[in-house]
Amino acid sequence: MRCRLTLPLLLSLILSAIPAAALDVLYLVRHAEKVDDWPAAREMDAYRPLSPAGVARAESLAARLKGEGIAAVYSSRTTRSLATAEPLAKATGKPIVGDDATTRPEEMAGFLASLREKYAGDRAVLIVGHSNTIPELLVKLGAKPECFQRLGITGQPGSLLTDGYDGLWRVDLKKQGCEAIERDTLKPNP
């Protein structure tokens, strides 16, 4: 009788000591270069496509991340962001998930928490955003003013930006603060 009670107790202690599986990494990237000469720039900006350089950079992103265990590809709903995500989605066989929370600072914390929960046990998720939303996401993920320069973030809280189209941010979700975030350069394919 004593053995029957001890074995389940022992098993539960062992299992509780094993850490729960968690999502390992978030990759963040600004959409690739968009066409400059868009006729309806203001009213139809959300539909502005990628330039040839942007298409090359999107293909470079796919080549760079296709072996990284991408479990999901999230994007804002603009044409340029979706087109940036498309080559990686095709390479990994993952659909693109358009989510407005990628562009709404007030929804970002909940969005990031839901990704951690939904993809617990997976290796990585990509988020494609914009020059003004990538910094907001990075702040929600632990970026502090002391690492803004290293991460390519400019401006003041409330109006942070990233410059250029070549940034690829890798956030190690097992770490915290600035040490969790690395910025790499993403060159377009020739």
What is each of the regions a protein language model found here?
Residues M1-L5:
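Positively charged n-region of N-terminal signal peptides that target proteins for export
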Residues T6-A17:
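Bacterial N-terminal signal peptides
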Residues L23-Y119, I134-P190:
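Active-site-proximal alpha-helix that buttresses catalytic centers in soluble enzyme cores
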